[in-house]
Amino acid sequence: VISCSSYRQAARQLGVSHTTVMRMAERLGRHCLLFQQRYLNGIGQLEEPVAVDGFETFEFSQYTPVHLNVAVGARTHFVYGFTDSELRRKGRMTQAQRARRAFLERTFGRPDPRAIEKEIAELLRLLPDGRVELRTDEHLAYPRAVRRSARIVRHTVTSSKSARTPRNPLFPVNLWDLLIRHSSSNHKRETIAFSKRRQNAAEKLAVLQVWRNFLKSFSEKKQDATPAMRLGLLERKLSVDEVLQARLFITRIGLPVRLQRYYFRETVTRRIPNGRTHDCTLAF
């Protein structure tokens, strides 16, 4: 899931059906949502600035772009969470492409123009308690999202044109965007392994999030502490076996309502209105 292999590539290597790999990835995504939340529930107060940005990708086709809104700790690089926002296709288009976009919007509906504002507000509510020192670029939806969230926020803005060096206040979230692009086959430029549903993209991102926070060193060269260690949640790195050693249940871990939509697979793709949900009786 995090090695930049598509489901079919992984299936060929393992000698199984690609649907088997897909089902296991879905289950792993649900587990990682709960695993992350179990540690987040133990954080008392937010004690570091948080950098927030929107990672742009798409679902089903390039006519349906999506923002994965992510929040990263400025000092620890701990990934606190994510939400998603449907977007309207923008940028330069031919007349035929504009006509195609218009047809799709008449048929399936048009994305909410305030989707980023609403989902950034949801993301802010997912953060631990306390005053939020928020760092973002100059996107106009962010100040509105701050007001909508009802959190106490100190908001500072950095130009998206500033050099993306370690001195940039948004460096932690820019680095996370880079790692997502680097480690995920569904987000590569001009890929044919793109996510058909953003629900699947969210599940893969949940796995990548746990890997980044609990298994990966802050620095690959130094092989030092993980973000979770820097945040004080753990004293050592975890292994894959330790992450998977016990089954986790949503009835025993307080998963926020916004994240429950990912857990139960309720994130709907307009072009696939009957996408599979997670409603197995024995799963609870």
Feature names for model-found ranges:
Residues 1-284:
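Residue-level recognition of single "structural anchor" positions
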